[in-house]
């Protein structure tokens, strides 16, 4: 279902946004529901999430499981089998499968989706797209905390009122989601501008988001060819100046 949403549905949504007038509400409740599924799936299945599960969460979970298994043994067997039980490890593939089975059960997945679906959504059209388009990466949903500047879902948490999400749909369009308990979220709901299409003309804003998306990337960032060519030219110029 997620792969289907990333295909024709996303193309249709981008077309609808592109053809809509400025400052109108372009996201329906259905759109937000569909986008929430795409965004949560992207957050959960990127390598960074799997790495965090493997290195941070899995060891704590397994420690509790082992201790519980030991205490469930008859007293006469505890000392004999304690060490063997404490050395039990799941293969990495089983760790991933356990995580996906937990995260993508309907009740858990829907709960994560509802956290962001109920937020305040804005659709940003990039007026700088010709020379400064939105970038993306192999970790495409930018999760950041207002104020602290921390990025990444495991540094912030989806339920944190300070957490905002930024997700480029294409080089010219992105969605931003604010908690409905944040100042922006409360104001947006009160003013009735949830789902509003707005034009971003400030280059600094676009550059800030692009740099954070690159910073949050696991291995790869995806930069449109014209921007990439400019970066390569600048690197070459700096190299030549350094040599001479």
Write out the residue ranges for each language-model feature.
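Alpha-helical structural context detector biased toward long hydrophobic helices
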Residues: 1-244
